[in-house]
């Protein structure tokens, strides 16, 4: 299936693949084929809480903050070079739904910005490291407090 999708995307000559809520694990051949062209947004401050149920995990662990991460996609689940993160507070008595709403508001802001950087040719993946305007980003990307 990934090969057929990859062939189709290659025929279209895509510059960027934008994932949001895509719950399928991409194969290593697919991620390598489109390395530096796949972005994902994940509802946690990666590398903390890869995978599912991030809001619940943050609540269960008594975290005081949560957030969202935009990253390049590689073969690891929610792996890949981090581009930008946004943090949100977790208040006493918060529910999963409240944290999710707060996080989602930030997702809308930062994903748009990162896609803009990519389209403007300002954002690149070089040797598995994210670069913005020719400068390597820190391991956790930029943090938008």
Question: What does each model-found stretch correspond to?
Answer:
Residues 16-133:
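Donor/substrate-binding cores of folate-linked one-carbon enzymes
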């Amino acid at each position: 299936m990934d090969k057929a999708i990859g062939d189709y995307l290659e025929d279209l000559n895509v510059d960027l693949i934008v994932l949001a809520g895509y719950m399928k694990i991409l194969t290593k051949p697919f991620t390598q084929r489109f390395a530096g062209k796949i972005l994902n947004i994940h509802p946690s401050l990666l590398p903390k809480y890869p995978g599912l149920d991030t809001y619940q995990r943050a609540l269960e662990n008594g975290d005081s903050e949560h957030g969202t991460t935009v990253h390049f996609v590689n073969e690891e689940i929610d792996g890949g070079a981090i581009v930008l993160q946004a943090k949100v507070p977790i208040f006493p008595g918060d529910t999963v739904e409240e944290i999710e709403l707060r996080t989602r508001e930030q997702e809308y802001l930062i994903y748009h910005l990162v896609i803009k950087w990519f389209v403007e040719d300002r954002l690149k993946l070089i040797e598995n490291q994210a670069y913005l305007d020719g400068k390597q980003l820190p391991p956790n990307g930029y943090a938008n407090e």
